[in-house]
Amino acid sequence: MTMTERLLEATKEIWDGYNETPFVKGIADGSLDHEKFKYYMIQDYRYLLDYTKVFSIGTAKAKNLDAMRLFAGYTHSILDGEMDIHRAYMTRLGIAKEEAEQTPVALDNLSYTSYMLRVAYEEGEAEVMAAILSCALSYEFIAKKILAEYPAADKHEFYGEWVSGYASDSYHEDNEVLADLMNRLTEDYSEKRKQHLVDIFTACSRYEAAFWDMAWEMRQ
């Protein structure tokens, strides 16, 4: 079993609950109130700014050129790739960049990013990867599960772009690169170190679940 497979197996119960949250269900069937999605977009925009910092710290923590290049590449990819989905929706929702950047970060969001940043600053490259992977892989998991249950969800006039973006082949390929690096970094890890990575990944998976609930309730 690879390290990535172990992480996913350990968090299966948490992940199976993602698509049962009211927010994700609303995206899936197209019924989600646009105000809730607007709130989510702003909070996720703020989240991604710190998420990118975690990748940047990973660049500094990397012990070889391949890992350094990967972390640095993803920093660029998020800022100029994934953020494009957000910018497109922000335009449609009438959200100015200034509004997004000046909106207070919700407590659940702040707790999540603070945890990831602490792991990144205090620990090594594999631990950074464990903190990163839950978000990256779970969005693909959610989008593909939506399509399995609602095959036309990627054609929805409003939420289709969100679903298709995270269910795309290119997003999957990016995730495969991340998972492969995690597996290579941990080939010689002790059981104790591997379990620590499971603990980090599990914590971030729980934070992901809380984020969906936060978005539904529009918590402050």
Name every feature range the model reports, one short phrase each.
Residues L197-Q220:
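Acidic, carboxylate-rich catalytic segments that either coordinate divalent cations
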Residues M1-E5, E9, Q220:
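Basic/polar N-terminal segments that are highly enriched at the extreme N-terminus
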Residues L8-L32, Y51, A179-D188:
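Short alpha-helical hairpin
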Residues S168-T202:
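Long amphipathic all-alpha helical oligomerization modules
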Residues K12-G17, S31-K61, G81, A130-E140, ...:
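Alpha-helical bundle segments that constitute or directly flank the non-heme di-iron/ferroxidase center
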Residues N64-L65:
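Short loop-to-helix capping motifs
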